[in-house]
């Protein structure tokens, strides 16, 4: 089985390769002393060229001490790699009960299908291309070997939208004439499978994916539905779904430029009041959502010790591909970058704000781990290195923003006991 060296090596980890490299050296004769070190050349460019050896090893692209990259050349490869990372399906470890298959040209269905990633359904998302299943997807599907369960009502493959499924799997089709209709049908399907109504519903733009992408990670984390609205109106399937989900708390992700107050007023005419989250900057929009919480809704990531996922806002289907990383492992929200080379200032500030720290013992500290989605043409190795540095555990000093109080600069003496006052016979004190 071949699923793409870059994608799978990044997803499955590098430990096995390192082990074999070390093991192979055991029987080798002792090497000759190395030749004199070459002359050091200082490069004046911002980025130094990577040595050939580093390129062959795959580091630091595949992983650094605080990051792991899913290095797929496109969203199809990213989805296959993430699915196999979350469900290794080897060594006696079972695969998922079901898988969702989504058209690679339909980012809206991918975001909406993320609610099926959440337990107990736990269906990772794979991508197809209309009437043809890509070899990466077919190989991943074979390795995952979904077997159905009571939680999926025996379904092994959820066919989302207009895609041709591979043969031999128990399939349930979710179809519709528009992204809004498909999203509403996915909402109904999850309710049927879990026999529960959602407590919360997340409304996103069906036309501006850079604001909608973070919804996929929350849907995977919570199982709550994602429904689509237009800028100034609400599609009929969304209205019908909101009426069915009567009583749920409603949240809208994105600025008024993506979802206007007029559209939200139309929602409120048939359902509950809507709370808006987000910002006109897509990077800050995702950060605001990662920080947000209201009751049981929201990530509330405002301190160190968490997983995070970073994708490019130019690759909306990577949000769906990466969704299983938000429903297992270190359960992280999706953040986005609009620059492939440099960490955006808003993202840099957020990572510094939740940067982990320690007072005296780093082994007792909490850590942040960050998944990078896409190959280095999507997100550069330089940006990955910057993220790794921002996530690094650091000794706590005053003003580090790690939410850990630094130790006092000098040992504090206990307060001296005040001298006792002479007592009168009646037990009172003298004036």
What do the PLM-derived regions correspond to, one by one?
Residues 3-8, 15-22, 30-431:
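Extracellular glycan-binding segments that recognize GlcNAc-based cell-wall polysaccharides
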């Amino acid at each position: 089985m071949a699923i793409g060296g870059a994608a799978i090596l990044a997803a499955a980890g590098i430990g096995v390769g390192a082990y074999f490299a070390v093991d192979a050296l055991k029987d080798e004769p002792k090497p000759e002393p190395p030749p004199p070190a070459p002359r050091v050349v200082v490069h004046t460019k911002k980025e130094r060229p990577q040595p050939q050896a580093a390129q062959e090893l795959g580091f630091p692209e595949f992983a650094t001490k605080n990051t792991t990259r899913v290095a797929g050349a496109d969203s199809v490869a990213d989805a296959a790699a993430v699915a196999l990372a979350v469900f290794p399906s080897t060594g006696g470890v079972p695969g998922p009960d079901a898988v969702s298959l989504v058209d690679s040209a339909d980012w809206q269905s991918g975001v909406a299908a993320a609610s099926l990633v959440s337990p107990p359904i736990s269906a990772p998302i794979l991508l197809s291309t209309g009437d043809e299943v890509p070899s990466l997807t077919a190989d991943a599907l074979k390795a995952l070997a979904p077997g159905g369960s009571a939680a999926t009502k025996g379904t092994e493959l959820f066919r989302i939208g207009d895609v041709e499924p591979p043969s031999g799997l128990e399939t349930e089709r979710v179809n519709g004439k528009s992204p809004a209709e498909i999203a509403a049908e996915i909402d109904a399907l999850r309710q049927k499978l879990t026999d529960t109504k959602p407590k919360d519903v997340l409304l996103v733009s069906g036309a501006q994916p850079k604001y909608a992408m973070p919804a996929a990670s929350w849907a995977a984390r919570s199982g709550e539905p994602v429904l689509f609205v237009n800028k100034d109106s609400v599609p009929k399937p969304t209205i019908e779904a909101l009426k069915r989900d009567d009583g749920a708390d409603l949240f809208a992700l994105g600025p008024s430029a993506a979802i206007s107050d007029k559209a939200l007023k139309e929602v409120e005419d048939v359902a509950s009041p809507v709370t808006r989250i987000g910002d006109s900057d897509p990077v800050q929009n995702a950060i605001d959502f990662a920080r947000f919480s209201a009751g049981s809704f929201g990530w509330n990531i405002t301190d160190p010790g968490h997983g995070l996922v970073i994708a490019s806002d130019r690759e909306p289907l990577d949000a769906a591909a990466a969704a299983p990383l938000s429903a297992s492992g270190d359960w992280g929200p999706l953040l986005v970058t609009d620059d492939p080379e440099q960490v955006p200032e808003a993202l840099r500030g957020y990572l510094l704000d939740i940067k982990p720290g320690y007072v005296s013992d780093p082994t007792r500290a909490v850590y942040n781990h960050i998944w990078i989605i896409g190959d280095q043409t999507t997100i550069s190795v330089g940006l990955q290195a910057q993220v790794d540095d921002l996530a690094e555990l650091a000794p706590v000093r005053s003003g580090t923003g790690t939410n850990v109080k630094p130790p006092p600069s000098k040992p504090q003496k206990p307060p001296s006991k005040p001298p006792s006052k002479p007592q009168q016979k009646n037990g009172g004190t003298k004036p």
